[in-house]
């Protein structure tokens, strides 16, 4: 789903991830709030960051970077790893890496629950990180029976993940939004309403309503907006933890070879050759860890 190339929900207790290259994308690691210990990230720009529970680490690989990961302490990392595509005009931009602490992110608290604005802009609040292209990342909880609206502009795609609990999802067009504020506490929704007859989807259950789906824990779906609209997220009789990632689709070819993502074979070959020639740099050796 453009602009995402890869999404991985991981539980990590070891070992270290050896130094490896990236080019043509941003690599993003979001550690969820129940993470224990930390993740140390070193790169060929001589950055050294230590991400902890709730933190976001964003590496713009651009024209090329090498980085490696090491666990810190008695670690049990619960997080998401994203590869976010860069449009062709940004694939040659200089690499960089940024660590955003969880306490720096806006947190919206209401009767419906709470949501962290990890990246992008939501409900008038801006996350602190300026990303190469706008990308919305929300890490939220819904109380039983509550719902939340998330705008989805025309031309954007969204990836929605039920990290915990059962999550209902309804698509609405902007021309007919429900006459309620963006965040609401709704009446408790009986669990039976989340089990309508309908065709089963690969990662969730589809209701008879084609604009409504149910995600069991660990399932995800994607949505595409051909015009401005909303996604309405609903919890039934138990709390629901969701992660939403949304951004504008990149209407360009994608050619991938592992950590290299380009728009054509020639650019891909050039990126691999640049890495093999040492143009991405290398990690400096420290504490006996090879670079």
Residue map of PLM features:
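Jelly-roll (double-stranded beta-helix
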Residues: 1-291
